[in-house]
Regions:
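Polybasic, low-complexity association/targeting segments
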Residues: 1-10
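Short secondary-structure boundary/capping segments
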Residues: 28-29, 55, 80
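Short beta-strand segments
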Residues: 33-70
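Short, structured beta-strand-loop surface elements
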Residues: 68-123, 129-133, 141-143
């Protein structure tokens, strides 16, 4: 995350974020013995980058953003930022992934909600505490287009089909 983002005014969130930034990794930064990841969003009104540490909910290289705000009646401020600017990045350990956040509905939301509650059981209590349906986003990774030099370097002689796909 090359561009410096704004820290949260909330003390515990700011402390978690500062620890991650100082260490250069999310490894070892936890809430209730559960790992967290660090999302970077863009402010809906300010356009400034914002850090959002959230519980780690991951499946097959995709990450969920659960807008629980501890079961508060209102969505967290980052929810509105992501709705306005869905280009988001996530740091997991020392790896950073960029993608597009998409709010989930129906069966897909139910699936990711199950994963979220398994990763951090208090989410279930938060949902009981509020009248709003807690939103869940999934971060869809950006496609990675390999340069021919990278493919040749990483993979000895791609087959004809792969070579054709790479040229297209």
């Amino acid at each position: 995350m090359s561009e410096q983002a704004e820290l949260s005014p909330t003390e515990w969130v700011r402390e978690q974020t500062q620890k991650i930034l100082e260490q250069g990794t999310t490894d070892g930064v936890e809430v209730m013995d559960r790992p967290i990841v660090l999302f970077t969003t863009t402010g809906a009104q300010s356009g400034k980058k914002r850090y959002v540490p959230l519980m780690r909910v991951e499946e097959n290289g995709r990450y969920a953003m659960v807008a629980s705000k501890g079961g508060d009646p209102k969505h967290p401020s980052w929810y509105h930022n992501v709705k306005a600017n869905p280009s988001v990045s996530v740091q997991d350990g020392d790896k950073v992934l960029e993608g597009t956040a998409r709010e989930l509905e129906g069966d897909e939301r139910a699936h990711w909600w199950e994963l979220a509650v398994a990763a951090y059981p208090p989410y279930a209590e938060y949902q009981e505490k509020t009248d709003r349906l807690i939103p869940v986003f999934v971060l869809e990774p950006k496609r990675r287009y390999w340069l021919k030099g990278e493919v040749d370097f990483q993979h000895p002689a791609p087959d004809a089909f792969t070579a054709q796909v790479l040229r297209e």
